[in-house]
Amino acid sequence: MGLQTTKKITPFLTFDRQQWAKLRKSVPLKLTEQDLKPLLSFNEELSLEEVSTIYLPLARLINYYIEENIKRQTVLHRFLGVKSPKVPYIISLAGSVSVGKSTSARILQALLCQWPVERKVDLITTDGFLYPLAILQAKNLLNRKGFPESYDIHRLIKFVSDLKSGERNIKAPIYSHLTYDIIPDRYSVVDQPEIVILEGLNVLQSGMNYPSSPHNVFVSDFVDFSIYVDADEALLKSWYIHRFLKFRCSAFSDPNSYFHHYAKLSEEQAVKTATTIWDEINGLNLKQNIVPSRERADLILVKGEDHAIQTVKLRK
């Protein structure tokens, strides 16, 4: 198979770009440059070559897993002698702030909804399960946003549990990056799709991340296939600062933006502010809560300097 060999004991098979790209086989690329543009995050560039090299082999692998999952469900139904409700295949996608989780999730959604057959693929972000801004302020958690304690984890677990129970018209709260808050009385409604992609910082976390709120089940208990998007922290920090600078001249300039006051910063002040936010919040959360969950993933995508994925690690 051309796998990289290593003396280190690991539960993962490791592929470089060229080795992974060969696993695409005959999967067709149906996306065009025009299709790709709206899938990219504000500060991210990604080519069709990256889609072909990395995401098409991944889509092929996931489709194999989905086929096996359907067979397993058929066996279970036959054994139990009952017809269970339709339940979606759940894919979780985790990683740090600024690593490009949202772009990866949207590309996967676009590929899986049209190959090998047309099917319904819903994308839900766990941002919607953050506590509303007023509650975070009341609990003095504003500077802990994104940390485990800032999420209504019981509501999130109830959501994924309902998905796996075959419930219909399940509501997921919607988060606004403009107002930095949950949008009141607005929801995404999930109604028995074939696949759900659940994207967020916390989808691989376990009980060790919620010591003050013990419970017996976690989001990962309901996930069929988990992905972690990885990169060196120095790269993540530089990407975050770069994104902050671009937002300063765009989204932050909107008077309705929660971060409107940052639009008035000079470039030097903006770099200093973004660096402080990273060091005191995002970087700390990365080290304490996000990186420790990485090894629980079924597949790890490792990015290099240009945001391109250089290495793929697949659980054996």
From Swiss-Prot:
Superkingdom per UniProt: Bacteria
Main location: cytoplasm
Keywords, ordered alphabetically: ATP-binding, Coenzyme A biosynthesis, Cytoplasm, Kinase, Nucleotide-binding, Transferase
Binding of ATP, residues: 95-102
One Pfam family in the UniProt entry: PRK
One record GO biological process: coenzyme A biosynthetic process
InterPro entries with a match to the protein in the record: P-loop_NTPase, PanK, PRK/URK
Class in the EC hierarchy, top level: transferase
Compartment(s) where it occurs, according to its Swiss-Prot or TrEMBL record: Cytoplasm
Signal peptide: none
SUPFAM superfamilies: P-loop containing nucleoside triphosphate hydrolases
Pathway given in the UniProt record: Cofactor biosynthesis; coenzyme A biosynthesis; CoA from (R)-pantothenate: step 1/5
EC number(s) from the headed UniProt entry: 2.7.1.33
MF term (GO), any: ATP binding
A cellular-component GO term for this protein: cytoplasm
Entry-linked HAMAP family: Pantothen_kinase_1 (MF_00215)
PANTHER family, per database record: URIDINE KINASE (PTHR10285)
Family statement drawn from the similarity comment of this UniProt entry: Belongs to the prokaryotic pantothenate kinase family.
Protein name in UniProt: Pantothenate kinase
Gene source species: Haemophilus ducreyi (strain 35000HP / ATCC 700724)
